[in-house]
């Protein structure tokens, strides 16, 4: 299961926590990139936030990973499930064909 994770800052974090949070974020990314759970990760230019592609076996695994996200308390997080485009297009074609008028 693949998910697009988007995070944006919703509240400033205390300055005294800044360095620790950045270092924790570096560790979190390294841990999950090296395990293959995070495929891609990036920051947004000019914004306090970023995103990535996370691959997990279950929603519970995704929840566990995101519970460790260091900036979680200071972020709005959006998670979107990703589906294969070709499979989605095939499903759409079948739906359209099923709704089309049939000659009797």
Regions found by a protein language model. Give the residues of each.
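Conserved, structured core segments of small domains
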Residues: 1-104
